[in-house]
Amino acid sequence: MAGNGSAPDTATHQVRQFDQARAEAAVRELLFAIGENPDRHGLAETPARVARAYREMFAGLYTDPDSVLNTMFDEEHDELVLVKEIPLYSTCEHHLVSFHGVAHVGYIPGNDGRVTGLSKIARLVDLYAKRPQVQERLTSQIADALVKKLNPRGVIVVVEAEHLCMAMRGVRKPGAVTTTSAVRGLFKTNAASRAEALDLILRK
């Protein structure tokens, strides 16, 4: 299992705007570049379709992470909160092909016992997955966003994913799974807490 440090700028975000016309023009040029005719039947609408798909696939670029973790509850809970097997679909920034898998996200609330809704954790995973990504950074961004908003005593994030850039090109090893982890706070400093969380995550 690979551990990760904080990626640069993971706790800040500049909201961007999607340029539909520019994306369509770029896809049209790409079709020319591979020797296709973008005006032929079957491809005439492809630039617009791909642009719309990219807008959806990269929607995380256009959403402020702070808007996702905007609901807190004072539950005075001081034990582990763990959400397992959160499906994720992301796009490798090196080849712009998909990687997909699951995320396991856990945290121990801070001294104030503040927690967020379980659906908010899933939305946070989705937000960071919907960007051009590398798995290591994705894992750290999820962890750092929870640290920033919840001020918890500890955070652990484990992501398991298959990368199509390894399955359909290059070494062509379908089924290979990459596992990354990010630990913060108590899970980084206390081996027993980390082992307990990992046991719960890996238990089927």
From Swiss-Prot:
Coiled coil: none
Gene3D superfamilies linked to this entry: 1.10.286.10, 3.30.1130.10
Pfam families for the chain: GTP_cyclohydroI
Pathway where this protein functions: Cofactor biosynthesis; 7,8-dihydroneopterin triphosphate biosynthesis; 7,8-dihydroneopterin triphosphate from GTP: step 1/1
Key words of the record: Hydrolase, Metal-binding, One-carbon metabolism, Zinc
E.C. no: 3.5.4.16
Binding residues for Zn(2+): 92, 95, 165
Any GO BP: tetrahydrobiopterin biosynthetic process
Class of the enzyme per the UniProt entry, highest EC level: hydrolase
GO CC term (a single one): cytoplasm
Catalyzed chemical reaction(s): GTP + H2O = 7,8-dihydroneopterin 3'-triphosphate + formate + H(+)
GO molecular function, one term: zinc ion binding
Matches recorded under InterPro entries: GTP-CH-I_C/QueF, GTP-CH-I_N, GTP_CycHdrlase_I, GTP_CycHdrlase_I_CS, GTP_CycHdrlase_I_dom
S-S bonds: none
Protein family according to the UniProt entry: Belongs to the GTP cyclohydrolase I family.
Quaternary context: Homomer.
Protein name in UniProt: GTP cyclohydrolase 1
Originating organism: Mycobacterium avium (strain 104)
Lineage, broadest ranks: Bacteria, Bacillati, Actinomycetota, Actinomycetes, Mycobacteriales
